[in-house]
């Protein structure tokens, strides 16, 4: 995550990133809106189908790895958002999918709220730093209430994809 630092009037600012990791790993075909799922299990199975159909990764590999990670602890962020993720042996580069459910599902999130927005993340088994950077970026992205609202309301997958991949963090005063 390349960040430029500017010193101005005795205050330190973080400047926008040139390109985000997330923008490089989310193909438009992996954005699915208003998917009907009644449970976390069904959502993981549907994610398996998305990655199988669009990226050629076996659905069972995807869902098994998502479940394995979820057994370690919930990947729910809160505020109706979850980031299920798993390590995939043999995967060459990280991949993502965004799914908005038609109705929220229980997810054991820290705030106890059900989840409607899911960002599925598949990571090569040998990647650690980039994995953490992508998770951090997603958490920052979805911590913005206005951004979450747009993700819940946008009716068009293409414009939602554009919003996701063009997102940049706001300048923040760190001094």
Question: Where in the sequence are the language-model features?
Answer:
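Cytosolic covalent-transfer regions centered on His/Cys nucleophiles
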Residues: 2-175
């Amino acid at each position: 995550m390349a960040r430029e630092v500017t010193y101005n009037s005795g205050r330190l600012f973080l400047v926008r990133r040139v390109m985000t990791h997330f923008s490089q790993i989310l193909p438009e075909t992996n954005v699915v809106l208003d998917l009907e799922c009644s449970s976390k299990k069904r959502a993981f199975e549907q994610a398996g189908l998305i990655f199988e159909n669009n990226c050629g990764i076996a659905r069972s590999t995807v869902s098994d790895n998502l479940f394995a990670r979820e057994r370690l602890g919930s990947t729910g962020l809160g505020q109706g958002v979850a980031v299920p993720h798993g390590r995939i042996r043999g995967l060459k580069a990280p991949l993502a999918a965004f799914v908005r459910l038609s109705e929220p599902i229980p997810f054991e999130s820290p705030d106890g709220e059900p989840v409607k927005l899911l960002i599925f993340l598949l990571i090569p088994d040998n990647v650690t730093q980039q994995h953490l950077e992508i998770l951090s970026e997603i958490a920052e992205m979805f911590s913005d209430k206005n951004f979450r609202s747009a993700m819940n309301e946008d009716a068009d997958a293409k414009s939602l994809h554009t919003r996701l991949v063009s997102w940049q963090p706001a300048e923040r005063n760190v001094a």
